[in-house]
A protein has these predicted regions:
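Mature, function-bearing regions of proteins
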Residues: 2-178, 182-315
């Protein structure tokens, strides 16, 4: 599935399956097919609802200054970004893993802790992040630029001091570079592990090169244009990283927060384990996560199964 921009999001009516059932219920095979179709549409509706503007409160919806449609896109068909960002499972796993990495930076954590509704509206925060990615990846250039401008305005207001009195600002180019490098690396790692294990090194570097536009537009410096450059940014920041009580609390909120519904509970739990497994060893140790080598094949096989099932449901 590609997570389409807000103006294109639509859930196919599940009621349509009922009409199909009445026309096709004629034997065990047609019954099984009808049940499968109902299940498929139900799963699709649940997943798409998470990204649907109608499913969020008026206060937390992503607002776009313009709805003017244009064929011009930041990333045209064939872009690697469109491929990598087009899978729900890998984006969820990569997004959570990236978030766990980002929170190890005291200034990033402080910005989220002091200025965000993260602790009280985790689902809303994740939804808004997902929609920003959807708009910038698949929306028109006008929609993408409007979303970027909105985020920049928000960043300008996020300022404060750390416990030791050191000032921080969300618009700090080095912090933006850290967030971008960890996010893109995590998205790509999840894609390679669960969708395209034979992805070429050239395509992986092309992903970073394409995403460099977003980093630069948001104000990041340095702007990473290859996997190696992203790795260098992450390695250079490691001496400043800390996992304190607040980082652990945010980690618990992310990993063990309530699922949107009971159906999603087992899938969410598996996804959280996959996100922890995706972390580099040093980050896993900082968080105090165990390294379940015996469980790792089960986690990866289960996540791969979920990914394939969701692709089937959303194709």
């Amino acid at each position: 599935m590609r997570i389409q921009p807000p103006s294109d999001l639509a859930v196919a009516p599940v009621a349509r399956a009922a009409d199909d059932n009445r026309a096709t219920l004629g034997g065990p095979y047609s019954l099984a097919s009808s049940v499968a179709k109902l299940a498929k549409e139900a799963v699709a509706a649940q997943v798409i609802a998470f990204f649907d503007e109608k499913s969020s409160s008026p206060e937390t919806r992503v607002r776009h200054p313009t709805r003017v449609q244009s064929k011009e896109r930041l990333f045209p068909p064939g872009a690697v970004v469109r491929r990598v960002h087009g899978d729900v499972t890998t984006m969820m796993v990569g997004g959570i893993s990236g978030l766990l990495l980002q929170m190890l930076h005291p200034a990033v954590l402080a910005g989220v802790w002091d200025h965000s509704s993260f602790r009280t509206d985790l689902q809303g925060r994740l939804r808004r992040t997902a929609r920003f990615i959807a708009v910038t990846t698949y929306g028109s250039k006008l929609e993408a630029e409007a979303a970027i401008a909105r985020v920049r305005r928000i960043h300008e207001k996020v300022r404060g001091e750390l416990a030791d009195g050191v000032p921080y600002a969300a618009s700090d180019p080095s912090l933006l570079a850290w967030v971008h490098a960890t996010e893109t690396t995590s998205f790509l790692n999840a894609w390679v592990r669960y969708a395209e294990p034979r992805m070429s090194a050239a395509d992986q570097d092309r992903y970073f090169a394409e995403m460099a536009y977003i980093a630069g537009a948001l104000g990041a410096d340095p702007v990473t244009r290859s996997r190696r450059e992203a790795r260098d940014v992450i390695e250079a920041m490691r001496p400043r990283l800390v996992c304190d009580a607040r980082a652990r609390q945010v980690g618990r909120l992310v990993l063990y927060g309530p699922p949107p519904n009971w159906i999603a509970a087992p899938v969410q739990a598996l996804g959280m384990h996959a996100a922890m497994d995706l972390l580099p060893d040093w980050a896993r140790r900082m968080h105090g996560f165990s390294n379940p080598r015996l469980a790792r094949p089960i986690i990866r096989a289960g996540t791969l199964g979920v990914a394939r099932s969701l692709r089937w449901a959303l194709q």
